[in-house]
């Protein structure tokens, strides 16, 4: 009689484990796996940004599950300057940024570099870390005014 109780208890444990596995798989399939979309409005043909350091660079970050945080850095090959970092407290599906040039003299010496934008969304994927999107764009700093001649 005790052998039958042990056998049936193992059966109940096995059925419970199966329900847990099915539940975890069903939950994992509902998670958002798409990375946030990063759009830089000043890009020329999707590659380079020509920046005169007077007008801000406009960046749009969006995702269906909401934006958790973002970071914008400029690297000129010798130094890395953090232009903007924020942890978004409200649940926003899109964030619009205007990145202005910093006033430090190190940044003003650069003639080109790369702009790196990293964004995380509110998804529970990656062990609640969220999905990550990284966009790197070349920046050409153009301080010269155009020369126009009237004939």
Predicted regions and their residues:
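Aromatic sugar-binding surface patches on proteins
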Residues: 89-103
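Short, solvent-exposed loop/linker segments at the N-terminal edge
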Residues: 46-53
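N-terminal Sec-pathway targeting helices
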Residues: 3-19
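Short edge beta-strand/loop segments characteristic of extracellular beta-sandwich folds
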Residues: 55-63
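Surface-exposed, short loops/turns at beta-strand junctions within beta-sandwich domains
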Residues: 103-112
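Flexible, low-complexity linkers/stalks enriched in Thr/Pro that connect modular domains
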Residues: 29-36, 41, 127, 135-149
